Amino acid sequence: MKVQVKILDQRLGQEWPLPSYATTGSAGLDLRACLDEAIQIEPGQTVLIKTGMAIYIHDTNFAGLILPRSGLGHKHGIVLGNLVGLIDSDYQGELMISVWNRGQNTFTLEPGERLAQYVLVPVIQAEFEQVEEFVATDRGAGGFGHTGQK
């Protein structure tokens, strides 16, 4: 599948590699922090970081997800401020990453550092059918631990 990409920061593809799949089994493309200089992200602080690129999916059967990189979250407490970024197929603006330091220590984010992943996913747009009752199931309305822990 082809997705249109507009490079907004010329350092992408010159100083830093363009997003690519690291292995044949990789699901995500790494997104980089397009910064002019390193920034300090204090514990509890949330900042919005430019990626230097815009992606236009065009096909309404797909959407993009911006997801955290596992190492940053586990080792440094750096996760996405909105937990998951949803990029609709008709969005054409620059991809931005909301970064939240949920850790205990100040984190230094360097220019060009890999910060998040972009994953393309299929989308099914549902049509709601209003009903008075649902067909009964064994589970019913049970949730939030209803099926047990083991």
From Swiss-Prot:
GO terms for biological process: dUMP biosynthetic process; dUTP catabolic process. Substrate binds at residues 69-71, 82, 86-88, 96. Pathway: Pyrimidine metabolism; dUMP biosynthesis; dUMP from dCTP (dUTP route): step 2/2. One of its GO terms (molecular function) is magnesium ion binding. Transmembrane segments: none annotated. Its EC number is 3.6.1.23. Keywords: Hydrolase, Magnesium, Metal-binding, Nucleotide metabolism. This enzyme is involved in nucleotide metabolism: it produces dUMP, the immediate precursor of thymidine nucleotides and it decreases the intracellular concentration of dUTP so that uracil cannot be incorporated into DNA. HAMAP family: dUTPase_bact. Belongs to the dUTPase family. This is Deoxyuridine 5'-triphosphate nucleotidohydrolase. It comes from Acinetobacter baylyi (strain ATCC 33305 / BD413 / ADP1). The gene is dut.
